[in-house]
From Swiss-Prot:
Binding sites annotated in the UniProt record for [4Fe-4S] cluster 2: 379, 408, 411, 414
Keywords assigned: 4Fe-4S, Cell membrane, Electron transport, Iron, Iron-sulfur, Membrane, Metal-binding, NAD, Repeat, Translocase, Transport
Gene: rnfC
Protein name (database record): Na(+)-translocating ferredoxin:NAD(+) oxidoreductase complex subunit C
The organism of origin for this protein: Acetobacterium woodii (strain ATCC 29683 / DSM 1030 / JCM 2381 / KCTC 1655 / WB1)
Keyword Hydrolase in annotation: no
Cofactor info, note text: Binds 2 [4Fe-4S] clusters per subunit.
Cofactor(s) recorded in Swiss-Prot or TrEMBL: [4Fe-4S] cluster
Enzyme Commission numbers on file: 7.2.1.2
Biological process terms in GO annotation: electron transport chain
């Protein structure tokens, strides 16, 4: 099979700093003594707890029931006893209702869990139902419920599924390790997704700095002519949904539209692998790969870890802090979220825990815009970040909206390239919040 090539216009080349974990063997987290399972592990309506303090639970048992279509159940990632159902700190910065489970160390699987069979055994509806029951969401970070993504509206026509294996965010190597160690499951998950939405074409996009992953996927695909691997130019944000679609299909997703409007379903390679895993074992999404890294970590590593394990436990399993951290980020340096405590749990969308020293975490003092236009040149959406940010700082929300602020994907390329060190993406993010607030008010 020939590997094809592609990229998009714009983007940046930050230091990728992936070597410290890409070249280290995958680690496997120890059995946790306690897990915290938030009722909000996905975009959409939070779940309602269906267990109470003192209950005994099995691994894989539902502990939270979804509310509404855009929601998925949450499951116990250990067997043991529920010791609390209460609000706990969450990666969003809020306190969220959570089920706290003390592990019995046995990992006794819920007896109702059975393998689903094979690809041939399952029809489209059965795949969607399995994906919902397994609590599968986008594992690239967005955590959008996957069964919703697979439920194509009648007025939309899709003709392909694209898997995102770009992993363009600096430091992170979770998807890289997944593609090299579970290539067969990634490909099987792609086939299941294709069958679910009724298409005969599938693509996997991987940045060209991951040649071993590309080789593993090509081998797993074999002679299936319906599937293709794209070697994508190493550039940030190559893994952004619209940029990935443009690089592989040449199609442009219109402003305000979704991938389905361009005839495409996009999902992360980790999501695809989990779909296959759930079919084979019957188990829900209860663990994931994540990268614990940064210059404040003693032994950076990508590790397989249970959902609900506190960040501090993951950090300790990677040797602990090498020095006092100046910043701890859930995710990567470009789009991750800074955390103020390390007792928050690993979420379904936690792709990384990035710990930076105080020196590395220093923020430069911004100065006045010099109108160099660099932010315009690198914007993958072809916006004018300098103008939108200026309007935002003047509270000119209508101007922000007319300059397409809502199309911003908040990738941070503009802030990174700005020689004046202006916090452009932060200003645009404020504008987007205000625009949404005004729309809700009907203004």
């Amino acid at each position: 099979m020939n590997v094809k090539h592609g990229t998009f216009k714009g983007g940046i080349h930050p230091p990728y700093r992936k070597e410290s974990t890409a070249e280290v063997p995958l680690g496997f987290g120890k059995k946790p003594e306690m897990v915290i399972i938030p009722m909000s592990l996905h975009i959409g309506a939070p779940c309602t707890p269906i267990v109470k303090k003192g209950d005994t639970v099995f691994l894989g048992q539902r502990v939270g029931e979804p509310n509404g279509f855009v929601s998925v159940p949450v499951h116990a990632s250990v067997s043991g006893k529920v010791i609390a159902v209460e609000e706990r700190p969450h990666a969003s910065g809020d306190r969220v209702m959570s089920v706290v489970i003390e592990s019995d160390g046995l990992d006794t699987i819920d007896p109702s869990i059975k393998p689903y069979g094979t690809l041939e055994d399952m029809d489209a509806d059965a795949i969607k139902k399995m994906v919902l029951n397994a609590g599968i969401v986008g594992l690239g970070g967005a955590t959008f419920p996957t069964h919703v993504k697979l439920a194509i509206p009648p007025d939309k026509k899709v003709d392909c599924v694209v898997l995102n294996g770009a992993e363009c965010e600096p430091y992170l190597t979770a998807d890289h390790h997944l593609m090299t160690s579970q290539a067969e499951k990634v490909v099987m998950g792609l086939k299941l997704a294709m069958k679910s939405v009724g298409v005969e074409k599938g693509f996997i996009g991987v940045e060209d700095n991951k040649t071993d992953a590309i080789e593993a996927l090509v081998k797993a695909i074999g002679n299936d002519s319906r599937l293709e691997v794209y070697s994508l130019h190493t550039k940030y944000p190559q893994g952004a949904e619209k940029q990935l679609i443009a690089a592989i299909t040449g199609r442009e997703v219109p402003s305000g539209a979704l991938p389905a409007d361009a005839g495409v379903v996009v999902m992360n390679v980790g999501t695809a692998a989990q779909i296959a895993e759930s079919m084979i074992t019957g188990l829900p999404l209860y663990k994931r790969y994540l990268t614990c890294t940064g210059d404040a970590i003693k032994n950076p590593q990508t590790i397989e870890i249970r959902i609900g394990v506190p960040f501090q436990s993951v950090i300790d399993q990677c040797g602990g802090f090498s020095s006092e951290p100046g910043k701890v980020i859930s995710g990567g340096p470009m789009m991750g979220v800074t955390q103020f405590v390390t007792d928050i749990p690993v979420m379904k969308g936690t792709s990384g825990i990035l710990c930076l020293t105080k020196e590395s975490a220093k923020i430069a003092t911004p100065s006045n815009c010099i109108h160099c236009g660099k932010c315009v040149g690198v914007c993958p959406i072809h916006l004018q970040p300098l103008n939108i940010a200026e309007y935002s700082q003047r509270n000119m929300w209508d101007k922000c909206e007319s300059n397409n602020a809502m199309d911003c994907i908040e990738c941070g390329s503009c802030s990174y390239i700005c020689p004046a060190k202006r916090t452009l993406v932060s200003s645009i993010r404020v504008a987007k919040r205000e625009i949404i607030a005004q729309r809700r008010k009907g203004n």
